[in-house]
Amino acid sequence: MKKLSLLLLSFASAQINYSGEINPSVMTRKSDQSQINLPFRIASLEGGYTFGSVDLKTSIAIEHRWNTGESVFNLREVYLAYYPDWGEVKFGKQIHAWGAVDGNNPTDNLNPYDYYYMFSPGTKRKLGTISFSSKIYVGNFQLEGIIIPKHEINRMPYGEKDFPLSMP
C-alpha cells in the first residue's frame, strides 16, 4: 500500500500540458463560390506529460470532408523523450524539422509531405514516421543522429478533381 501511495504521489507531481484548436472551415473558389471538397483538419490537440527528465508527447488531428461527412482520426505524433545531462533521446512517431527558413527548406527532408496541406506552414505539412533520434551536446556544439527504419512515402492527392494543382 505504501508503494502504491508513493507511486501515485510521484505521478501527481508530474506536469501535464495540452493545447488544441477547432477549425471548422470551408474552402471555396473565388470564380464561382463553389465549394472545394478536400480534406482539412477540423480539430487538433497536442498533449504532453512530463515526469522529471522524461516526456510523453502527442499530437492528434481529426481530418474531415464536408462532401461525405467523413471524419478520420490521425495520430500525427506520439513519442517518448528522455533528457539526460549530455543531450536528448527520442523514440516513437515523430515529425523532424531541420532548420528554419521562410519557404521550402532543402535540408528538411526526413519526413514525407502531406500534399493536401502543402500550403500550410512548417510541420503541419509533414507526416510523422516511426524513428529514433538523439542529440549529444559537447561544449558549444551538438551532434544529432536520426534512424528511420521504414521509409514512408508522401501522401499525394491522386484522383482529386478539386485539388488546385495537377499531379504528375
Predicted regions located by residue number:
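Short catalytic helix/loop segments, enriched in acidic residues and glycine
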Residues: 36-47
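Transmembrane beta-strand segments of Gram-negative outer membrane beta-barrel proteins
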Residues: 15-30, 41, 54-58
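Outer membrane beta-barrel
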Residues: 48-163
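A generic structural signal for short coil/turn motifs at secondary-structure boundaries
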Residues: 29-33, 65-68
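Generic cytosolic/nucleocytoplasmic N-terminal low-complexity/intrinsically disordered segments
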Residues: 1-2, 89
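Sec-dependent N-terminal signal peptides
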Residues: 2-12
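Conformationally flexible catalytic loops at phosphate/diphosphate-handling active centers
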Residues: 164-168
